[in-house]
């Protein structure tokens, strides 16, 4: 009996790699409508999305989009991450800002948390030329981080045009500071493509480009963001189709 079990196990182990090399099944067209697929994704991610402090905000965004109540303990973690000097919290802030803009259309933030959200947006360090010293390493210079910081600064400035931020600049000044840098970034992406091409950073670049396209008040920025987003998706399709 033990030899039979060994034989079965050996055959199974040999079969697994062979099976893994078989072509994947796929369809040339979706099996359901866009709204059905969107609802399925939001339902799944609302319950199973990342709980990591940097990325937990995306689960909360999915919950808001699907009509579920926010997890307040997780939202407090989101605010804490943004108020910290932690590297990559520009990912977190860009998603939170998207939620803030969507909340203006259909309210889902509880009243008791809105003050803390505003405080962390006004206090954020939006670029390395802010006089406040970083207490930990923060990456500003790579392709995705450049635009994440500038997008967050533009959208934050739009929200609080006349309000003084912690660094002494008001919202309009932040908008001007961000626009100058964003226009150059968008021009370079459209002319030369992405230096972080076909990388996992595309997902955060989709986020920032969608934020600009959906919420930027400047029509030129909005138009250019749409064109660069089209270019990014074209890159993805070329890779998928093995052209």
Language-model region placement:
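Bacterial N-terminal signal peptides
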Residues: 5-15
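A composition/secondary-structure signal for short, hydrophobic, low-basic-content segments
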Residues: 15, 33-34, 67-72
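Boundary at the C-terminal end of the N-terminal hydrophobic targeting segment
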Residues: 18-20
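Extended, charge-biased low-complexity segments
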Residues: 23-28, 35, 40-42, 59-62
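Short secondary-structure subsegments characteristic of cysteine-rich extracellular domains
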Residues: 220-236
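Conserved small/polar residues in nucleotide/adenosyl-binding loops
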Residues: 241-243
